[in-house]
Amino acid sequence: MSRIEYLMTSETSGWYARLDHECPERTNQIGIWLDSWLEATRKNQPIAAALPKSWPTLPAGLLSNPGSVLDHLLARFDAQRDGRSPRGIYAPPAKFVDAVLYDELHHGRSRKKEPPATLSLAALPPSFRTFAKQFNENIREEGVVDEGSDEGTKNLTVSGIPIPFADPCVGAGLFAERILRIHAERLADYSPIDRREDTLRLLEGLQLVDTSEVAVDSARKRIVIVLSRLGLVDLDGEGDDGRIGRSEAEMIVESNVRCIDPLRGEWPWNEGPMLLISRPPWLRIKDRFRGHPEGSILRKNLSRELRQFKGADGKVRFSAIKGNVNLYRLYMERSLQLSQRGGRVRLVVPSSVLREKSSLPLRKLLVESNNWDSVWSFPEDSRLLFGGSQGVSVIGVTVGEKTDVLTSFGPLLSDDFSPGRGLVSEAPFFELERGPWSSWTDASWAVPKIPRDASDRSRTLAAIGNLADKPRLVEEGTGLNPGGRSIKVRVGEVEKSMWAKEICDWTGNRGLIPFIRSAHIVFKDGMGVLRHPSFESEPVRELESRNSAWKGPVDMSVPARIVCQAVVNPQSDRRLVWAVVPEGCVLGNSVSYLDLPDEVTVGLKERFGSLEDGLSFLATQLNSEELDLWSKAWAANNNVNNYEIEMLPFEIIEGGATFSLFRNEDHLD
């Protein structure tokens, strides 16, 4: 983030804090803002002129887009209502939403077909020109689309907006406002009557819902205000040739912006949307009802109801629930259900959806029952503040068709937006063809996170290709684990807060046992090494000596182990670091380790002379550059869970060939 952006963000955040002090009731904030915006629109003034004098002065960064302020006010209201802190809560910026909409309208299903290739007459000898002219006329006749026909205009406004247009989480109407602005921009050269008629058609084709009465009321008022700002609604009269009267506009908007629960309710329109674009709430069940005296009971009841909910057809509505109930995953599945076959769905979701295990059923639904054709991926450091600590993704799906190729754009930055188009042509992307994609992911349809730099991209894709067909680390019957008991990934036995009295700083006194934490494992010269004062002849950092000794029960010490440090900083050069902890140490639960079957440890001792030497050999292999590239590519988020470690592709290589720990068998065919 640049210094100017930082200062503007700080300035606007300070304004919201001052507003909370002046007007603590958030519904009043929203109501006053909407009333002031309406009054300023009627008088053709900036909104600052209509705000109460007791309100803090609007900073320059908020003057130009009243809708953005409304989005933030509603986002803060929603956070407080759920018991979450409103600090650090942001709404998607207009520039981001415009990019999604322009990309869909220009380059999605609604784009006009490319004109067929014709022959240039000037480039041909005179004797060929008569033939070429007739050839070109035939081509044009075959390729023309009659835009006046019913087929060409049935589900499309003159401005090119597919209808019905839906948003099942309309919020304060952000997507609706931006689509109306694009609509007005495209009709700028049309007659006033045509603009009015096409605007009526678009309004009647809106399908906007939300579970919050406050959101629905905000969206309704915002749409009318924006239409007036665009010269399409008359706020003080019955309208004219180019403008809709306020009462008529409000009647249509009230009918098509409704307060319902799209997850548990029925869609109130007979015709499903042809274009659905939304940013569903990025909430887990445990994010709901925080601070409520009966929050736990309410969360359990809601989770149970959503898992078992049946629609009007008597069938369970949500088939892709796995693990905890996350609302954005339910909204994704519901959006596919609501849309017409052949309709388009664009959703703004956390990037974890692309790789996390719990989203696997949803990805299968996207790929195997629909045409998931595109995804944009913005990493955590892309300056999209509304993503918080998570990456942001935008998925594009054609409902009910077959997925052959997914085009993955990313990692993207805010500089990759192109005004009026979507993304710049230089935005990095790669294509996942269904066959290789299925092989890479064992048909989990995860989307890898590929670096932006061209050489790093090539190395990562090569690593994925080389490792995809290797056995997984915990598999049985492999060269590492020939027996029938699988390798387990576990965490160290000592939880720091529970054993705080038994943990102290390292002093070197007799009776102290080395206590190994994640901070003691570092990557140096291509190896994972322990930086613990008990193993170092030279002084170590205070961080490494603090809380590094165990004075509790001796039986908590463990045999030699191969351990893994998960590096949670996305800016770090590595994601996983493997090292060997010698016998006689105590492990904290910030460190994961491999629980190896007896047959594996015996095999390592026989081949390498000692268990520690065998584990050191394995650690060297696990610290390979290829495996690190793999782990970064398939990381669901900054956290490393056991499943990610378990599914690492691993095959023991020695002297350029694979080998097995089976007795009397050196190499595998």
Predicted region positions:
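Short, well-ordered loop/turn elements at secondary-structure boundaries
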Residues: 159-162, 169-170, 201-205, 252-254, ...
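Short, conserved catalytic or adaptor-binding loops enriched in Gly and charged residues
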Residues: 195-200, 240-252, 307-311, 365-369
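Signature of N6-adenine DNA methyltransferases within the class I
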Residues: 1-10, 24, 91-96, 172-177, ...
